[in-house]
Amino acid sequence: MKIDELRTPCYVIDEGKLTENLLILNGVMQRTGARILLAQKAFSAFYEYPLIGRYLSGTTASGLFEARLAHEEMGKENHVFCPAFLPQEMDELVEICDHIVFNSVSQYLLHRDKIEKADKKISVGLRINPECSTQEGHEIYDPCAPGSRLGITREALDKAIKNGLDLSRIEGFHFHTLCEQDSDALETTLAAVEEKFGDLLYGLKWLNMGGGHHITRADYDIERLEKCIMHMRDKYDLEIYLEPGEAVALDAGYLETTVLDIVENNGIKILILDTSAACHMPDVLEMPYRPPLMDSGEPGEKKYTYRLSSCTCLAGDVLGDYS
């Protein structure tokens, strides 16, 4: 079937490019011994899970339903993190997950009994907050922003230890501080992790460096990434995990859409599409950013300039201006 024969709106996945990305990620795994997981919140096209599972170690989930999807469709390592878990969800999570990461000490203590009574061994981790911001321009995605709810600061962890927390049952630490960044930001973050939590790393089995690593981007510094991985692996005798999302599927697909109408207001020609930023590309509004459009230019660069918008009733549901 040709692209112009597809019913729209429609996501089209380029398996060739997806495989190229997976080969890059698998190369990092082979050279460093790190285990790389698919972050399903970024890409959950489960039809591709058998392909992804041939190259990566497993998946990470942001809740019960993603964890269930990974369990059913990939069947490899199944990690889950959520800022707070519902007690009734934990009953199923302990059956289908291998690693469960808690956002706070109180969450760990709340669910500890179910984990210890589970029929299988579950590796428990805590999400830490190294309080090291490396992002500029999109603070909405910065887990280290002042007052962040994500991760445990060293001050909070020390208080819990003083109050009797037994860290011997915690096998790993997890941090996720990056967003579409290069490995220099990881290097900066690791320096903060070592400064604040280094003394505790020696007693752990694994360290999960989270996502936000743009590993498959053409200009990404993979050599620096691998040095970071091997430094933490060798110094602290840790198994290292990474959980990229966008890097798995970067540039490996398209959103096909159809122009339904053209309206004009104040000299602006506006295309009404059968797609929506709010529904199909929420980051366009939340980040915000201007998604690339095939064969287009900046406004005014080419002969015709249009504003791309949607058929929803949200006035601000606009993708951007293109020529």
Q: What do the PLM-derived regions correspond to, one by one?
A:
Residues 34-206, 228-231, 272:
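Active-site-proximal beta-alpha core segment in soluble small-molecule metabolic enzymes
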Residues 21-31, 69:
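A short, N-terminal amphipathic alpha-helix
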Residues 16-24, 192:
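A non-catalytic, amphipathic alpha-helix used as a structural packing/dimerization or gating element
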Residues 1-12:
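Generic N-terminal amphipathic, Lys/Arg-enriched alpha-helix
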Residues 228, 239, 244-323:
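Charged (often Lys/Glu-rich) extended helix/loop segments that serve as interaction or gating elements
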Residues 187-192, 221-227, 257, 323:
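Charged helix-capping and loop-helix junction motifs
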Residues 39, 177-178, 207-216, 244-246:
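Glycine-rich beta-strand-to-loop/alpha-helix junction loops that act as flexible
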